[in-house]
């Protein structure tokens, strides 16, 4: 069986919650059929990404990650996870979509195709078109782009012009499963509300959940122990992840 690959990218400050989430990703890599975690950093990027442009180092980390994710999934296939993903269980079912179909995407707020978590076979028409358009735009702009220019905006435009590229992809309505809280409500729903609020977030199918940068940033003043021993809605999901090992 071909090795199942999960790709991540991180540079800069190591936030405490990010460290916890990454440990969970690695721990679950031995669950089910297993997968290989490939954490790409500024130290090893040349091993995985070809033809890195001269302006890459001047791009903000979020845009660097956008560039990396398209390249590695197009070239190698696998699953891309943003580093603020909380893996709750085996990812076998997501890899099954890559093996039985072309892959999967998630709609943020059930409306916007999103690039934070997705999976694909290598070199599909969609991935090759996305990569081509991304490189063209970056070269024109010398890497100086808007927040979602090469992410959700680009894959949304491809959907409108070449919707057939998505025919063999599973598209999740995120609010119903993997992205149950829209980004602007994440701190309120996962951190601020009482612990029992987790009951409004759990879904029938939920091998992972999307968190956002506001969540790991607001917890940074706590120690890892304080985060793990907290009584916030997010603790239900962290504890469930450990239980599902």
Q: Which residues are covered by each model-predicted region?
A:
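Small-residue hinge/turn detector
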Residues: 67-78
